[in-house]
Amino acid sequence: MPILFDCNATAIQVLRDEASALLESVKQFQEPNDLEAIVKLILKSQEKGGKLVIVGVGKSALVAQKIVASMLSTGNRSAFLHPTEAMHGDLGMVEKNDVILMISYGGESLELLNLVSHLKRLSHKIITFTKSPTSSLSKLGDYYLSLKIKKEACPINTAPTTSTTLTLALGDVLMACLMRAKNFSQEDFASFHPGGLLGKKLFVKVKDLLQTTNLPLIAPSTSFKDALIEMSEKRLGSAILVNDNNELVGVLSDGDVRRALLKGLSLESEVKHFATLKPKSFKNLDALLLEALEFLERHKIQLLVCVDDRNKVLGVLHLHQLLELGLKA
């Protein structure tokens, strides 16, 4: 099927329409509004063990679920409630000190309107996101933020596009205000994302990834040939020279090997003659991975050899392991 329109022009128009709506919405925060009261309400609810329950139907339900996810990831108790399911038992998830946020662009959704009276009966405060404070839903609510837009970005001005983008943005506004009110830090964020990059930077320690077995340990008197075999078998790109007490003597890196070969040294030569003696080592196993990465890059080495206070080898960590985790110094 031939495309009889300019896709790029359409993309530009959609993005401009949505960006324009976001900028237009800034005006509501330059005039008297309920934002600060809403933030205080949610914080007070949290102090009493309550949560933010977000309600929506259709596309608003999907947006509501994203806002819930953002709230949870920043330490704010939150849950999604579908209005239809609420009328058939799920209302039981709403607890005494919870605050309710109801999202409906038009503010006339029957599912939400039917639910409001039950929530009000239970003395819950209602926040509404709708296009007008005079909508049926917002008139029943206690606090309001505007979703007013000039038009949807879709070609026929009907599919939720601009309105859902603005709704997401208002959810971000709430989240950001709560984060600032609670002095939410990078460390706090990482604690909720232990598997993410920030979590790895802030929480995973050297000892958590340290390889302590199958190490390429060799004696200083080992032949160059046998050292190469050990390096090949252990696949760390290096061999570690230790004495009879397992104390670190040197490291044979792939760079050392190349330099030795260029010099034409015999394969039977003892490895101690061309290894790096008294190499850089690392003692703090409680150090974060980022500190280990900075150490490796600062000394321009690839293998972090960890030792104890008596210089005995405990294990290793390779630069590639850290880079594969997405870490950058």
From Swiss-Prot:
Name of the protein: Uncharacterized protein jhp_1324
Gene Ontology biological process: carbohydrate derivative metabolic process; carbohydrate metabolic process
Alphabetized GO MF terms: ATP binding; isomerase activity
Alphabetized UniProt keyword annotations: ATP-binding, CBS domain, Nucleotide-binding, Repeat
UniProt domain CBS: residue ranges: 211-267, 276-329
InterPro entries, sorted: CBS_dom (IPR000644), CBS_dom_sf (IPR046342), GutQ/KpsF_isomerases (IPR050986), KdsD/KpsF-type (IPR004800), SIS_dom (IPR001347), SIS_dom_sf (IPR046348), SIS_Kpsf (IPR035474)
Pfam family, one: SIS
Binding of ATP, residues: G56, V57, G58, K59, S60, A61
Family statement drawn from the similarity comment of this UniProt entry: Belongs to the SIS family. GutQ/KpsF subfamily.
Top-rank taxon, per record: Bacteria
Ranges of residues in domain SIS: 38-184
